[in-house]
Amino acid sequence: WESGDLELFDLVEEVXLNFY
């Protein structure tokens, strides 16, 4: 993945963990 995608993935993963 590109750097931007990795940053977005990290953000989504963090939000998902907080969501669950």
UniProtKB/Swiss-Prot annotation:
Stretches assigned to the Lumenal side: 1-20
Alphabetical UniProt keywords: Chaperone, DNA-binding, Endoplasmic reticulum, Membrane, Microsome, Nucleus, Transmembrane
Subcellular location: Endoplasmic reticulum membrane; Nucleus membrane; Microsome membrane
GO MF, one example: DNA binding
Positions of the J domain: 18-20
Membrane topology field: Single-pass type I membrane protein
Entry keyword Transmembrane: yes
Listed GO CC annotations: endoplasmic reticulum membrane; nuclear membrane
Major subcellular location class: endoplasmic reticulum
Quaternary structure note: Interacts (via SANT 2 domain) with SERPINA3; the interaction delays the formation of the covalent inhibitory complex SERPINA3-chymotrypsin, but does not alter the catalytic activity of SERPINA3. Interacts (via SANT 2 domain) with ITIH4 (via C-terminus); the interaction protects ITIH4 against in vitro cleavage by kallikrein. Interacts (via J domain) with HSPA5. Interacts (via cytosolic domain) with ribosomes.
The protein, known as: DnaJ homolog subfamily C member 1
Gene name, Swiss-Prot/TrEMBL: DNAJC1
